[in-house]
C-alpha cells in the first residue's frame, strides 16, 4: 500500500485514505481502469505491467507536491510507456485542470531528466465521489476568458489538456 505524505491526518481524509488503500493494489486499479478507460486504450494496455510509481514531486521552489496515485504501464506489443494519473475528488473543483496540468508537467520533467525524449503520454483520470455532480469543465482551455473576436487566434497558444472523469 502506498504511503501517505508525512504529517497526513488520515482521519481528516477518510475517503482519500480508503481510495488509496483500495486502488494502490495493482489488481484493483487494473479492474477499475479496464472498465472505465476508453476501450481503444484499455485494449492496448499490457495489464500485468501495471505498477504504482511514486506520486510525490519536489518543485523548483522546493515545495513538495503529492498527487493521489500514479501508475506506469506498457502498451501491448510495444515498449511505449503510459502513465495513468489517478486523482480522487470529494468536492467539485473548477481549478482541478490547473492542478492536474502541474502534476503532468512534473511527471514529464522527471521522465525527461531520467530518460530523455520521447516523453510518454500521461492520462489523468479523476474519480469524483461527492454530494454534488461534477458541473465544471474537464478542459484546461475553459479556464481562460478569451475575447470573442480573437479567441480563435489565441486558442493555438493555450495548452490543450483534458482529464477523464467518473462522477
What do the predicted segments below correspond to?
Residues 1-167:
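Accessory alpha/beta interaction modules
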Amino acid at each position: 500500500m502506498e504511503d501517505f505524505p508525512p504529517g497526513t491526518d488520515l482521519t481528516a481524509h477518510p475517503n482519500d485514505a480508503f481510495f488509496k488503500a483500495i486502488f494502490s493494489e495493482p489488481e484493483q486499479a487494473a479492474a477499475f481502469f479496464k472498465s472505465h478507460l476508453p476501450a481503444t486504450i484499455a485494449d492496448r494496455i499490457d495489464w500485468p505491467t501495471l505498477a504504482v510509481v511514486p506520486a510525490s514531486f519536489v518543485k523548483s521552489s522546493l515545495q513538495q507536491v503529492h498527487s493521489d496515485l500514479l501508475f506506469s504501464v506498457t502498451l501491448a506489443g510495444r515498449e511505449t510507456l503510459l502513465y495513468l494519473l489517478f486523482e480522487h475528488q470529494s468536492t467539485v473543483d473548477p481549478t482541478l485542470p490547473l492542478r492536474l496540468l502541474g502534476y503532468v508537467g512534473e511527471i514529464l520533467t522527471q521522465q525527461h531528466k531520467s530518460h530523455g525524449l520521447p516523453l510518454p503520454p500521461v492520462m489523468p483520470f479523476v474519480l469524483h465521489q461527492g454530494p454534488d455532480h461534477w458541473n465544471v469543465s474537464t478542459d484546461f482551455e475553459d479556464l481562460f476568458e478569451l475575447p470573442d473576436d480573437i479567441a480563435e487566434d489565441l486558442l493555438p497558444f493555450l495548452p490543450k489538456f483534458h482529464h477523464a472523469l467518473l462522477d
